C-alpha cells in the first residue's frame, strides 16, 4: 500500500528495516497518481500537498500499521515550523521542503 504523509516519522511499533530515498517533485507527482491512502493529519497540510502534487489529498488522521512492502510518500520540511503554527502553502514554500519515499521491509 502507498501512504501519503506530511512527515517522515516512522510509526510507533514499526521496528525493522526501512529504506528512504529523496525524490523530486515531478517524481512525487508520478508516485502520488498510484492508488494511495492519505495519512495526512491536518487540512492545511493536505491542501498544500494537493496544490503541489496536483491531486486531491484528503486530511485523514490515521494511525498507520505498516506491513512489509508498504511505501510512504512523505513531505519533508527543511526546518521545524514555529510551535503551534499551522502552515499554508506560501509558508511551506518559504520554509522549503522536499519529498521522500520510504519503504518498509519488515
List where the protein language model places each region.
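Short, extreme N-terminal segment that most often corresponds to the first beta-strand
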Residues: 1-15
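Intrinsically disordered, low-complexity, compositionally biased regions/tails
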Residues: 17-20, 58, 73, 100
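Polybasic, proline/glycine-rich intrinsically disordered low-complexity segments
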Residues: 65-106
